[in-house]
């Protein structure tokens, strides 16, 4: 029989991993893998069209519309067709990305939040494990068994909340350990240095005044 406590813990762990890494990062990684398998031909066509359009633009810029009108018109038609094909390919890739994002978000929600809700509701009356008799006061025992598990046991909902709290605490501890310590910076002296810098200027002004008096 599958251990229900372990299943709930793994679902909670998966949810926390998604929160730590970031949904957008996971979605980008998944779409890159999906594109490499299913959209490699379209992506290669996009790169080829983009390269061709750039070459046609450069050649069109070097061609005079007055001196070489026939060649210029031919290049212009070729460039317009290339731009139209490139836009069509870009729209195809954009549509595929949008569709993939919706499906991936739905799948991710079902695997994390949806699975947690389903497990908590489906096994709401089943105790995950029992507490020793008299180990906690009655209000705490009732809270741990909420909503429908027997008093004295830990319900699936309470167990999921405990797992989330423990994982969040571990995350905070790891982040505090990995965080760089702020560098010790001493106070910047301003008064004495400015006073020292002002002394030569004061001496120069006094000497100038004495010379003016002598003159």
From Swiss-Prot:
Function, in words: Required for the post-translational delivery of tail-anchored (TA) proteins to the endoplasmic reticulum. Acts as a membrane receptor for soluble GET3, which recognizes and selectively binds the transmembrane domain of TA proteins in the cytosol.
Keyword presence, Membrane: yes
Keywords: Coiled coil, Endoplasmic reticulum, Membrane, Transmembrane, Transmembrane helix, Transport
Region named Disordered: 182-202
Assembly notes: Interacts with GET3.
UniProt name for this protein: Protein GET1
GO CC aspect terms: endoplasmic reticulum membrane; GET complex
GO MF, any single term: protein-membrane adaptor activity
Gene3D superfamilies documented for this protein: Helix hairpin bin
Cytoplasmic compartment residues: 25-108, 171-215
Family label: Belongs to the WRB/GET1 family.
GO BP annotations, alphabetical order: tail-anchored membrane protein insertion into ER membrane
Coiled coil ranges: 73-94
Membrane topology note: Multi-pass membrane protein
Organism domain of life: Eukaryota
Annotated localization: Endoplasmic reticulum membrane
Parts of the chain on the Lumenal side: 1-4, 130-153
Membrane spanning residue stretches: 5-24, 109-129, 154-170
């Amino acid at each position: 029989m599958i251990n229900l406590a372990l299943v709930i813990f793994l679902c909670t762990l998966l949810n926390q991993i998604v929160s730590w890494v970031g949904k957008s990062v996971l979605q980008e990684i998944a779409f890159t893998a999906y594109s490499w398998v299913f959209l490699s031909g379209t992506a290669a066509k996009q790169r080829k069209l983009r390269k061709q359009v750039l070459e046609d633009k450069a050649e069109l810029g070097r061609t005079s519309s007055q001196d070489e009108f026939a060649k210029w018109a031919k290049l212009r038609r070729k460039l317009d067709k290339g731009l139209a094909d490139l836009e069509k390919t870009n729209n195809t890739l954009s549509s595929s990305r949008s569709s993939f994002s919706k499906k991936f978000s739905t799948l991710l929600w079902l695997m994390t939040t949806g699975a947690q809700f389903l497990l908590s509701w489906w096994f709401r009356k089943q105790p995950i494990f029992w507490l020793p008799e008299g180990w906690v006061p009655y209000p705490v025992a009732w809270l741990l068994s909420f909503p429908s598990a027997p008093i004295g046991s830990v319900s699936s909902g309470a167990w999921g909340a405990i797992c989330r709290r423990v994982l969040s605490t571990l995350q905070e501890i790891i982040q505090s350990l990995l965080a760089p310590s702020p560098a010790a910076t001493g106070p910047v002296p301003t008064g004495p240095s400015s006073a020292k810098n002002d002394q030569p200027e004061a001496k120069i002004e006094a000497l100038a005044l004495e010379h003016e008096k002598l003159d």
